[in-house]
Amino acid sequence: MASSMAPAAAMAILLLALLMPATLCSRSGPPSSKHGHGGHAKRAPPPASPVVPVAPQAAALVRATCNSTAYYDVCVSALAADPSSTTADVRGLSAIAVSVAAANASGAAQAAAALANGTAPLAAAAAGDGTVQALLRACAGKYGDARDALAAAKESMGQQDYDLATVHVSAGAEYPQVCKALFRRQRPGAYPAELAAREEALNKLCSVALDIIALLTSSPASNNNNS
């Protein structure tokens, strides 16, 4: 009996020996691979957030609108700097243009006051000249008037009174010219370069604003569809 079972037992042991490596490989293979990749997964950065499409620097309407102005590059730069310009209609673009001009006038008023008070980096030249300081204070006032005129223009545009808005923007462009004229009469050559640059920028910004407002006065109905 024992002798007859010996071959069977030997065969069973042999089969078991053959099957065990395959069984162990089938059980250990995936976990090993899983642990290997899992270790890297823990150290890997989290999945990147979905990429949000970036709006072009100048939307089609911005470019088309700026083509109607005398200073295309200034117009595109001013409007595209405001994120809302990519979804604004022409009336919205005109409001942005006026706001940019008002910000320029406000900055010029502060710069002129700083030069007059001796707190600006380039104020040393005016420190000992009472006339220049008085002129700078007058310039600060004129740029302040320009800022207020442009703020009034924006209010008029909100009421869709584009004719009055045009008057205010035109006034905003003219106030700084008084500053330059005062310097030419009383201190030729002493007009600060910073104010000269700001005056030129404000003049161009006001021109852009006026050109865009003109689009509203020429065909207001077509520009109120998105309001």
From Swiss-Prot:
<dbReference type="GO" id="GO:0004857">
    <property type="term" value="F:enzyme inhibitor activity"/>
</dbReference>
<dbReference type="InterPro" id="IPR035513">
    <property type="entry name" value="Invertase/methylesterase_inhib"/>
</dbReference>
<dbReference type="GO" id="GO:0048046">
    <property type="term" value="C:apoplast"/>
</dbReference>
<keyword id="KW-0052">Apoplast</keyword>
<dbReference type="GO" id="GO:0009827">
    <property type="term" value="P:plant-type cell wall modification"/>
</dbReference>
<keyword id="KW-0732">Signal</keyword>
<comment type="function">
    <text>Pectin methylesterase (PME) inhibitor that inhibits PME in vitro. Functions as a critical structural modulator by regulating the degree of pectin methylesterification and the physiochemical properties of the cell wall components.</text>
</comment>
<feature type="signal peptide">
    <location>
        <begin position="1"/>
        <end position="25"/>
    </location>
</feature>
<dbReference type="Pfam" id="PF04043">
    <property type="entry name" value="PMEI"/>
</dbReference>
<feature type="compositionally biased region" description="Basic residues">
    <location>
        <begin position="34"/>
        <end position="43"/>
    </location>
</feature>
<feature type="glycosylation site" description="N-linked (GlcNAc...) asparagine">
    <location>
        <position position="104"/>
    </location>
</feature>
<keyword id="KW-0964">Secreted</keyword>
<feature type="glycosylation site" description="N-linked (GlcNAc...) asparagine">
    <location>
        <position position="67"/>
    </location>
</feature>
<keyword id="KW-0325">Glycoprotein</keyword>
<feature type="region of interest" description="Disordered">
    <location>
        <begin position="28"/>
        <end position="50"/>
    </location>
</feature>
<keyword id="KW-0341">Growth regulation</keyword>
<feature type="disulfide bond">
    <location>
        <begin position="139"/>
        <end position="179"/>
    </location>
</feature>
<comment type="similarity">
    <text>Belongs to the PMEI family.</text>
</comment>
<keyword id="KW-1015">Disulfide bond</keyword>
<dbReference type="GO" id="GO:0009505">
    <property type="term" value="C:plant-type cell wall"/>
</dbReference>
<feature type="disulfide bond">
    <location>
        <begin position="66"/>
        <end position="75"/>
    </location>
</feature>
<dbReference type="GO" id="GO:0046910">
    <property type="term" value="F:pectinesterase inhibitor activity"/>
</dbReference>
<feature type="glycosylation site" description="N-linked (GlcNAc...) asparagine">
    <location>
        <position position="117"/>
    </location>
</feature>
<protein>
    <recommendedName>
        <fullName>Pectinesterase inhibitor 28</fullName>
    </recommendedName>
</protein>
<dbReference type="InterPro" id="IPR006501">
    <property type="entry name" value="Pectinesterase_inhib_dom"/>
</dbReference>
